[in-house]
């Protein structure tokens, strides 16, 4: 039983890895399930067993990449001078990841088109909870205005996500990026108890 579970986990990881490459290179619509499975020596049956269908595989890939993005953004925030600067750095880092071709294609373009509203994705819900906890501490410490913490967290995360979506969909992402980050910082600054 343990060996079977281990084989299933390995097959799942192989399929996610192959899908990341195929979805980034060809896009979701053009990526063939047969090419995906044969690239890692598995059958369509393995894909269906692990993910239900191609859409389920995309959801697993998006969840993995989006979780990596959140972790990377949190690392950027941890390097900032204080918790407020950390919150701003996390949002800016998330927006900047829209320049990564894999993130751009899979998470910000194909993900919403196939999976729907990103704010409903499990990885986004997890990120929202982390932001809400940070906001609660900033309010308690007097750094932020005493607004509803969940509302503020949802607006901050939504602003970063929508800025990243804008960058990804733009014909000139590198030109749009600084504008998006500047506007995100200005919007967030409105939540400060004592504006900079």
Task: Please annotate each region the language model reported.
Residues 1-26, 30-42, 56-59:
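Basic, helix-initiating cap at the start of DNA-binding domains
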Residues 11, 54, 61, 65, ...:
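Hydrophobic/aromatic residues within well-ordered alpha-helical segments
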Residues 24, 48-52, 59-60, 64:
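Base-recognition residues in the alpha-helical recognition helix of bacterial helix-turn-helix
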Residues 60, 74-103, 153-156:
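Hydrophobic alpha-helical connector segments
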Residues 95-133, 140, 165, 169:
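Short secondary-structure transition hinges
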């Amino acid at each position: 039983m343990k060996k079977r579970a281990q084989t299933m986990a390995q097959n799942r990881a192989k399929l996610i890895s192959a899908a990341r490459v195929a979805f980034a290179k060809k896009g979701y619509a053009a990526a063939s399930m047969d090419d995906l499975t044969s690239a890692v020596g598995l059958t369509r049956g393995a894909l269906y067993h692990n993910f239900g269908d191609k859409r389920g595989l995309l959801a697993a890939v998006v969840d993995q990449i989006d979780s990596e993005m959140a972790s990377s953004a949190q690392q950027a925030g941890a390097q900032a001078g204080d918790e407020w600067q950390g919150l701003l750095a996390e949002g800016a880092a998330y927006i900047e990841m829209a320049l990564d071709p894999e993130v751009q294609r899979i998470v910000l373009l194909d993900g919403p088109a196939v999976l729907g509203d990103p704010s409903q994705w499990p990885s986004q819900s997890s990120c929202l909870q982390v932001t809400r906890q940070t906001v609660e501490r900033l309010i308690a410490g007097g750094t932020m205005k005493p607004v509803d913490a969940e509302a503020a967290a949802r607006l901050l995360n939504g602003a970063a996500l929508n800025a990243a979506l804008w960058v990804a969909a733009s014909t000139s992402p590198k030109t749009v990026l600084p504008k998006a980050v500047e506007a995100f910082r200005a919007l967030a600054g409105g939540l400060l108890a004592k504006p900079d």
